[in-house]
Amino acid sequence: MASNNVAQFAAELKMPAGVLLEQLQAAGVQKASEDDALSETDKARLLDHLRKSHGATDGDKRKITLTRRHTSEIKQADATGKARTIQVEVRKKRTFVKRDDVSETGADQAQAQTDEQAEAELKRREEEARREAELLEKQAQELRERQERLEREEAERRAREEAAEAERRRAEEEAAAKRAAAAQAEAAQQAAAAREQAQRAQSEPAEQSAQDEARAAAERAAQREAAKKAEDAAREAADKARAEQEEIRKRREAAEAEARAIREMMNTPRRAQVKAVEPPKPAEPPAAKAAEAKGTLHKPAKPAGEAAAARPAAKKPASGAPAPAAAPAGDRTKKPGTGKSGWQDDAAKRRGIKTRGDSSGGVDRGWRGGPKGRGKHQDSASSFQAPTEPIVREVHVPETISVADLAHKMSIKASEVIKVMMKMGQMVTINQVLDQETAMIVVEELGHRALAAKLDDPEALLVEGEIGSDAEQLPRPPVVTVMGHVDHGKTSLLDYIRRAKVAAGEAGGITQHIGAYHVETPRGVVTFLDTPGHEAFTAMRARGAKATDIVILVVAADDGVMPQTKEAISHAKAGGVPIVVAINKIDKPEANPDRVKQELVAEGVVPEEYGGDSPFVPVSAKTGAGIDDLLENVLLQAEVLELKAPVESPAKGIVIEAKLDKGKGPVATVLVQSGTLSRGDVVLAGTAYGRVRAMLDENGKPTKEAGPSIPVEIQGLSEVPGAGDEVIVLPDERKAREIALFRQGKFRDVKLAKQQAAKLESMLEQMGEGEVQNLPLIIKADVQGSQEALVQSLLKLSTDEVRVQIVHSAVGGISESDVNLATASKAVIIGFNTRADAQARKLAEANGIDIRYYNIIYDAVDEVKAAMSGMLAPEKREVVTGMVEVRQVFKVPKVGTVAGCMVTDGVVKRSSSVRVLRNNVVIFTGELDSLKRFKDDVKEVKQGFECGMSLKNFNDIVEGDQFEVFEVTEVARTL
């Protein structure tokens, strides 16, 4: 519809009429109201105004561009001399612009440029003037402040001077007044003396004058005393300042003297010190002493160490060597002692490799035995004969050994071993590691006996007598493991026994670490192991049952036997450990101990009152009821077991828990099972070894040693050991390192073999099942047990469609290497009771890596499960939306068959799919090509209306057919 007035044009533009009136007035079109007529010229002026205001130009309408092409052919000879025809196309392009537009545009541009330059110059001058005014104002302000400060100082000085002058004048006036008063008093006294009687006139004025004179004398004395005190104080202060300066000067001189003495002492040669402390040699002739002390022109004085080394050679007349003093001047042989000091020679001797037939340690002989060194050593060689009989050694060859270590075991040079290996066809280096078979062949080739050492077995390194066969067996405290279902009160029971509050500090109120404590009771010491009750911590409970003597099975009286209770019973029975049942929470109203007993009897735990061997003790961790009876039963079981262990022997134990502390390094909680573990011992725990640098008890207090059944926390291992590894004390750190490295290599081989098998298995499964979604994860936990439990729990979530892939799992904080690994593998990092450092957080933000922190295992498992649910392919469901009956069929050229239909049920949508039914049999399933009502395309047709429909790629439509219209919806799935 054409717009004739302002209101209609505004409705067409979908904008308020008031705004359109403002734009028209700005464009120079005078329209007062919405009903004013609007012509095409007015619209054109409005359009030009809007284009100019938005920066558009109408240059495209005022210029014409012509392009002309011209094609020609040229002939040119190629490299072979043949003529070739080449098509050449020439393009010419010309643009024609109206002159008035060009001139107007140029003038406008020049004017605009001039205006801009003038405006910029004006702004620059205004800015300079403003800056200059600010600078002048600032300088004037500073000048005013300086003048005010000087005036204030001058006023203060004048005020002080005036006050001092007024004080002086007041003092003079007081003194003059006192003198005038004294003179008047004397005159009055004299006049009174003349009038009155002589005796009385003389006595009274005399008293008054005496009092005045005494008062004046006292004032003068006080002034003199004050002046004297001020003078003494000033003199005292000056003396004190002079004394302090003198003290500072003396200290400086003393420090300089001390520094000078230290420099002189450090610059003093060492040989003078050695010579001063050398004991006298009475057996030496005095002449030799004088010669050595003074020296000669050809032989300077030797240091004390070198002279002492030269004396034994001087006592051997059979050597035949000429004296150094008698050597000719032209002899170029290097004399001992002319260029090296004694301590340098000793160091050279120590560095040399001692071999048979060379007692000098290789000193003063180059690595090439040249002719220059032969004459010097011929006589010394005659004094020592190498053994002619070969020495056959028994060499214990471990699983792996380096070339240098093998040569050291045979007491030969490493180069000899390398030569033998080269003859055998192998090029090796001094640090290359050989396997056991190759090393044994080399040993036999060199004429020694090779024995295979079983270094992986720690018992082979210790003599049976040292292990404890002769050590005295002494009674040891029992190790008691507290087991049961989650939230049955295991930690609370231990807290009441230990008088501690561990359960209150647990995240989520559940135990997620295995804890070790020892408690002193009136009847002895008892060591407790607290295990988690959650189903994920199966391995922790198994370790606790392995290291224990007695199991306390905690069962809640109001809950009964639960799955983890049954698991704890199976662990205890597998280890052959006696069970003491503690029925907890008997203080609750809903407690039913009899039902608990019946359920435990069904699991094979029979109470003593029923004829079994398991004592049942009802307890309450809240009120403390039955705790003493429980401890009594535990100690009674320990007495029956007669637990003993050697004390004076190397310690053996088991790793209860291990973690990586940021400040302490690898930390392991060890339960000593036999012997005594002391600080400084060399321990081996699985693939980790080291010397015990620090040892703490369960309360964090340092301890020097730990006996049997005592849990301690040790530091100083090379890496984090595995929870459950055996700990043994070895006498030699080198052997411990050798065993640990061998175990690492074997563990690495087994791990690689498992990975290869897993890869092959997963590849075959993927080929059989198709595409499988993977959720890569990197898990970092605070302790080994938590990491192990979390990995197992997450791996159990894997299904046939979505699998959890543990890229890496370790103990400790989240580092930059973990973030880089996550970037490469596109994994999510899970931190369980750990945090990422600043560099790792920054790198994760830069690379978009998701880091999740958890302190409760439930939360971690639930969130990973939700993430896996989101990765599942959605389920597709068909929803029938309507039914259509074909009433008439039309054949349309170039279109196909069109069905005239009636919607009998539901609704038909343009985007729906269609299923064609003929006699209730599906003959086609496809999509709608068009949906029309009369001549218009529509999006949907509801029930009771007619419509026209055509199907894609299907024209076999017959009257009476039915169309079933349906939609496919996707429904999210969950695990």
Curated annotation (Swiss-Prot):
Region (G2): 509-513
Binding site for GTP: 484-491, 530-534, 584-587
Example GO molecular function: guanosine tetraphosphate binding
Record field: compositional bias (Basic and acidic residues): 48-63, 120-177, 212-263
Pfam short name (any one): IF2_assoc
PANTHER family documented for this protein: TR-TYPE G DOMAIN-CONTAINING PROTEIN (PTHR43381:SF5), TRANSLATION INITIATION FACTOR IF-2-RELATED (PTHR43381)
Protein's name in the database: Translation initiation factor IF-2
Species assigned in the record: Burkholderia mallei (strain ATCC 23344)
Name of the coding gene: infB
